[in-house]
Amino acid sequence: MSRVGNKAIEVPNAVKVDIKDRNFISVEGPKGKLEYQFNHRLIITNENKVITVKRPNDEIFMKKIHGTTRALLSNMVEGVSKGFQKTLKIVGLAYRAQIKGKQLILSLGFSHPVSVAIPDNLEVVVNQNTEIVIKGIDKQLVGEFAAKNVKLRKPEPYKGKGIRYVGQYVRQKAGKSAKKTRKD
């Protein structure tokens, strides 16, 4: 059984945490501000720059959301203090990326360029037309936007063409072997 929910969250000095109505949490730091409303049955306290999450009983539902709530709070604190980043790499001949305004334009071998709207809370940078860096304070939003772009053209197993996370291993398959002809 996981004990994630029992760990306390240390809050850096630059981060300010406000708890309203026992379940509405506002976390503000140098990178920005995040707000979230958690389950009202959990007891969340902030004492001496340490956040603790307690559950009132050992019901199965309470056990499930206890660890999840603690992880979400930890991600909020880390996001407003350090931020989150995901880097994508585009592999393939003539596969390119560029930014026009609040749109990410991808050329991925389709008959048309693919346009993806960049959310307001994210910063997207394209390096050398083949590397996309996604930065933001909300871990979920950064991950969703990265996954959405990878899904547009997943790496294929023969040549590895597509969009992948930097450091992701793409397993390569052997291509068809030539048919042997017999000479008599």
From Swiss-Prot:
Q: Name one GO cellular component term.
A: cytosolic large ribosomal subunit
Keyword list (alphabetical) reads: Ribonucleoprotein, Ribosomal protein, RNA-binding, rRNA-binding
GO MF entries: rRNA binding; structural constituent of ribosome
Q: Which GO terms describe its biological process?
A: cytoplasmic translation
Does the keyword RNA-binding feature in the UniProt annotation? Answer: yes
Keyword presence, rRNA-binding: yes
Q: Which InterPro entries match?
A: Ribosomal_uL6-like, Ribosomal_uL6-like_a/b-dom_sf, Ribosomal_uL6_a/b-dom, Ribosomal_uL6_bac-type, Ribosomal_uL6_CS
Which Gene3D superfamilies does the entry mention? Answer: Ribosomal protein L6, alpha-beta domain
Record's function text: This protein binds to the 23S rRNA, and is important in its secondary structure. It is located near the subunit interface in the base of the L7/L12 stalk, and near the tRNA binding site of the peptidyltransferase center.
Instruction: Provide the assembly information.
Output: Part of the 50S ribosomal subunit.
The UniProt entry's sequence similarity note says: Belongs to the universal ribosomal protein uL6 family.
| Name of the featured protein | Large ribosomal subunit protein uL6
